[in-house]
Amino acid sequence: MSLLFLTICLITMNTLVIFDFTKEADLKNWDVINDTVMGGVSAGKMGKDAAGNGLFEGHVSLDNNGGFTSVRYDAGKIKLQGYSKFIVVLKGDGKAYQFRVKTNKSESYSYVYSFETTGNWQTIEIPFSSIVPSFRGRSLNMANFPGDYMEELGFLIGNKKEEHFKMAIDNITVQ
């Protein structure tokens, strides 16, 4: 066997797919949460583009003290032992977003990692050790994401300005 083949096998064996967007992928466990829960008027939606990629898009408004929209995926309990980072393949719009993950979906806080998009397809690598606990934009005095398991993940845009946004997502894995 060639060294290249063995390397590919080893890399693939240590990758767990959390969600792979395809034309057939069901979005029933993806929910949009807008700032309307707090009186705002921002509007985001989750769908698919023509290629089958996940498409999180909409408009963030600052009216009525709003300013964010988010999408969450209820993944069920997934063990993450043996992995050290999330990998997200996406195409953004040049804006800043947050990747958010919860160990227990009923917890009020999330673990958050902020990233910038380029407007091109890119691979975002998110080390578990860099995902920080946060509640409503405030850092918490707790350890960073432990990486034992997760139940929910998602994305949030809230850059303290009114803006349209659009982010396509190909897949989310852990390695």
Predicted ranges, named:
Residues 1-17:
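Bacterial Sec-dependent N-terminal signal peptides
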